[in-house]
Amino acid sequence: MGLSRVRAVFFDLDNTLIDTAGASRRGMLEVIKLLQSKYHYKEEAEIICDKVQVKLSKECFHPYSTCITDVRTSHWEEAIQETKGGADNRKLAEECYFLWKSTRLQHMILADDVKAMLTELRKEVRLLLLTNGDRQTQREKIEACACQSYFDAIVIGGEQKEEKPAPSIFYHCCDLLGVQPGDCVMVGDTLETDIQGGLNAGLKATVWINKSGRVPLTSSPMPHYMVSSVLELPALLQSIDCKVSMSV
């Protein structure tokens, strides 16, 4: 880490600032209710949702040649077919997908304490939102949680040539804010993208949000700092700046 004070903080979005996993679970529960009440599925409803969750976790597509709506509707169509058999049911798949999507967007909320933290931090440093993912999906999340006004810039991996952990997207963020990598801190919940990316780009520090308290594998990227909540960040940044002051 360099000897300059922190001038900018890059935040991940999903499961760092908003509870994407929790919102997705709520969406799945609504689909289960739909399948059980309207279509009289029993245990198959949960099996279908479990299959979709696996497909989402392994999702890989080219954003310039494939529509995320088509990809994710197909996840539901395949899961229904694999579970129930019979003819493909695109209409039911679409109903499930849009219910899941709309429900989870309703629950993607920027909590009041997070808003307050961002507001206070922005008085001292520049803030940038750096999120991987499909352009449409991430823009919808940003709109849903209404976080635009808390940041000086927003960068979405799906709109760039490379996503986290590629150094190039971090350098692009630095250019947008007029800062150097050694001035910046990356905050996120994913070691392989947020932390590894910050390390690759030579940022001043990386902060891992480890809500579950899990112990990282020895082969995993090692963050400079680890906290259980993003709300611990202001105190941590003060500590980092104090170390700089003592070193100068």
UniProtKB/Swiss-Prot annotation:
Inhibited by calcium. Inhibited by vanadate, sodium orthovanate and phosphonate. PANTHER family: N-ACYLNEURAMINATE-9-PHOSPHATASE. It is an enzyme of class 3 (hydrolase). Its cofactor is Mg(2+). Keywords: Carbohydrate metabolism, Hydrolase, Magnesium, Metal-binding. Belongs to the HAD-like hydrolase superfamily. NANP family. One of its GO terms (biological process) is CMP-N-acetylneuraminate biosynthetic process. It catalyses: N-acetylneuraminate 9-phosphate + H2O = N-acetylneuraminate + phosphate; N-glycoloylneuraminate 9-phosphate + H2O = N-glycoloylneuraminate + phosphate. This is N-acylneuraminate-9-phosphatase. It comes from the Eukaryota. Phosphate binds at residues 13-14, 131-132, 164. The keyword Magnesium applies. Its EC number is 3.1.3.29. Catalyzes the dephosphorylation of N-acylneuraminate 9-phosphate (Neu5Ac-9-P) to sialic acid N-acetylneuraminic acid (Neu5Ac). May also use N-glycoloylneuraminate 9-phosphate as substrate. GO terms for cellular component: cytosol. GO terms for molecular function: N-acylneuraminate-9-phosphatase activity. InterPro entries: HAD-like_hydrolase, HAD-like_sf, HAD-SF_hydro_IA, HAD-SF_hydro_IA_CTE7, HAD_sf. Pathway: Amino-sugar metabolism; N-acetylneuraminate biosynthesis. Mg(2+) binds at residues 12, 14, 189.
